[in-house]
């Protein structure tokens, strides 16, 4: 407009070309500083677990049950029941979990934020969450969005006649999107070429939270199969699992079965659990594809302000009810879509199926010869009836040679399906919650499940005198500081803040598979010596506690030898798990394929070593200063894997000095690569040319990266020796106690 006032600002804060635009390969330390107090509106002393315990749980469930059939004009319930919609909401919240790095899942309510709130697979879930707002508003901070989303799915099942296995609360909300999760590199929704084109052949390794850069490959492994990039667990950008029309839209049930096995396996489900989840979930509700997709508007993150967080505005007909467009598929599986039954499997096997298309043009299946006509109700018009229909991914349960006998057994034994679905659903919605110590609420099952990494109950705790005696024996055992520190680190650093698995509690370092991991070679000698000390001391302390105590005693000694008298805090209470309590296959995903804190890498990866270090630090919930001080301290303590001298920038190994930083920042040293791949370096005296040090990428990044160098300068300063020791001890104790939820 001619009379429009000109804004004095062309851009506002945060706009313009960013550092990431200029240097896209730059190490992104921001992932270490997510979810801070600055983004959290709750009071500093707010305790969600305490608030949840004050919740009138049964009253909440009663309100949720009433909501199921309280259809709203602005978003009418299919078949008069919101249950199927809420099941999908809970499933899609939990279903983002993947075992590769433990990220994703329902644990913090991320479905409220980008990108998940705008994924194509989550169309209409904006409506589901908005239907819940009056209930969330009523109960306030006593129930988090994360818990409410999952609980609502459970109540939905119960309201339709299904007996669930239980529910546990304890998922605290966060207030901003996760920035550490790698969802893929595709730039368009539903793209899948990059995640298959980038996948490595077996035995190589493409992992962690940031994409690798390399030429496009064919997306097929050596056996000719689709090979999905790790750690991803979905076949296309913006999907939870598989394309329901079949791989890349190809309606091939057998090929779909292979995709299903891969994706569900990557979220910790075996074949029986997978069949149970699909057959159980598709006992309810329908999909939505009333018209062409070009009737659907922008997703929530791209929609106008007037939409108030809603997205996908639909201009087809009324845009709701019978005119809803979600996936583009128009499928109703059974004649009782709001009642638990075994009809899904009966229909799957009793009809022969032919390919057809939805009103939106998507591939789906109908019974041949017009069978099943008029057996299925319409979701909104009582005068209409339909035949049952299926997705390509449904037919995979019948035509995949592994799924078929499982599905047929469930068809013939409905009680087995009910039990398997109840257990698999419970696993789905709790998989990222960690140990039972985090579970809350009156509906927690009594049965302990192997996938929960069970631990025995703690017995009597060692006294202060017992602790002192064991520390003295450890230090007199002949074990070196490096051996004790590296063993404690190996035990504790398996923890993942993503799914709260791993850690020192349980002493699983001595059990399969951890005892056989490449990263843990040489630790058997230390473990044997510690077990002997424990036994000779009358078993007054668990091995799990003793491993940590021994490492902490070594840190105290190393600090004392550097002239700093400091006590490393130690809290007993850890227990020793048995091999029977340890699922070898489940724990295998915790193996450190690379651990920059120990200068260890099992193989060469397409991801740079410093990015693997950053990924590890984020999983350990470390800040950038904690990352920095730990690497510097572990190097001078000699904790490198296999006794490697790379990064040990000190002539006093085993003494807790700030020498790593002082020598890395020494301008008298010139660094040059010694390998063609720039993985290894040597530092030479600028005057004499003599080699003084050798280092890895992980070591040199602390002098190269501007932020890490700034932190290194703090710890390398002349007056920083005491601060370095203090900060190292604090970060050390943090890692040692990451899995001590009993202390929090």
Swiss-Prot record:
Gene Ontology MF terms: catalase activity; heme binding; metal ion binding
Positions of heme b binding: 282
Record-level GO BP terms: cellular response to hydrogen peroxide; hydrogen peroxide catabolic process
UniProt site (Transition state stabilizer): 88
Record's keyword terms, sorted: Heme, Hydrogen peroxide, Iron, Metal-binding, Oxidoreductase, Peroxidase
EC number: 1.11.1.21
Keyword Metal-binding recorded: yes
Membrane-traversing stretches: none
Signal sequence annotation: none
Span list, region Disordered: 1-21, 361-387
Crosslinked positions (Tryptophyl-tyrosyl-methioninium (Tyr-Met) (with W-91)): 241-267
Catalytic residue list: 92 (proton acceptor)
Keyword Iron applies: yes
Post-translational modification, as annotated: Formation of the three residue Trp-Tyr-Met cross-link is important for the catalase, but not the peroxidase activity of the enzyme.
UniProt family annotation: Belongs to the peroxidase family. Peroxidase/catalase subfamily.
Protein name, UniProt field: Catalase-peroxidase
Provenance organism: Pseudomonas entomophila (strain L48)
